[in-house]
Amino acid sequence: MNINIKNLVHAFSKLPSLGPSSSRRLVIHLLQNKEKVMLPLASSIKELADLIIECKVCGNLDTQSPCSICTNPKRDTKLMCVVEELGDLWAFEKGSIYSGMYHVLGGRLSAINGIGPEKLNLDNIPKRVTEFKIEEVIIAINPTLEGQVTVQYIIESLKNLDVKVSRLACGIPMGGEIDYLDEGTLKAALTSRQEYESNIK
């Protein structure tokens, strides 16, 4: 196999859900459809790579900072949903089921993987609550063991602030991923969200 083609296959294989076989099929499709698929795709990727930046307010990825969500006057600025990754934010947005603000952590705490609070967008949460006078923080963290540790860290960081802290209602299985949920399930979990009993007064 040509080294350039081999490198492209290897690059695709690093993407989520793509193994060597799937990557080879994708590359073959691109090579066989150079004008219609390969060149437009390469152009779009290059353009986005040059423009994409992280929102200095919420951690979203956009072509502007603050991002298009943070600057949208129709969003409810008193409501903030904390999510792990960009994919979780997109899951809420695709169904138009949420109209508040977001806070993207960029992952979850993991002692095994060496991910501490300093590597995540955690310390800005209480700062945003205070600065923007947020009234409710919705914690939409994936229900894993590491996710639970992350949730406890967030709750502890907000304990001295006058803010309601809630979580998505039951329905998301342990170990489940928010960005894989269908819109109906996610909407129900959000609508029926519950305030943490040990709230931070």
Curated annotation (Swiss-Prot):
InterPro entries cross-referenced by the UniProt entry = DNA_Rcmb_RecR, Rcmb_RecR, Rcmb_RecR_Znf, TOPRIM_dom, TOPRIM_RecR
Please list the GO terms describing molecular function: DNA binding; zinc ion binding
Q: Keywords of this protein's UniProt record, alphabetized?
A: DNA damage, DNA recombination, DNA repair, Metal-binding, Zinc, Zinc-finger
- Could you mention a single GO BP entry for this protein? DNA repair
Q: Which SMART domains match?
A: TOPRIM (SM00493)
Disulfide bonds listed in the record: none
Provide the Toprim domain boundaries: 78-173
- Which Pfam families does this entry report, sorted A to Z? RecR_C, RecR_HhH, RecR_ZnF, Toprim_4
Chain intervals annotated as zinc finger (C4-type): 55-70
Name the CDD domains on file.
TOPRIM_recR
Keyword set includes Zinc-finger: yes
Q: Belongs to which family?
A: Belongs to the RecR family.
Biological role stated in the UniProt entry: May play a role in DNA repair. It seems to be involved in an RecBC-independent recombinational process of DNA repair. It may act with RecF and RecO.
- PANTHER family noted in UniProt: RECOMBINATION PROTEIN RECR
Q: What is this protein called?
A: Recombination protein RecR
Q: Which organism is it from?
A: Wolbachia sp. subsp. Brugia malayi (strain TRS)
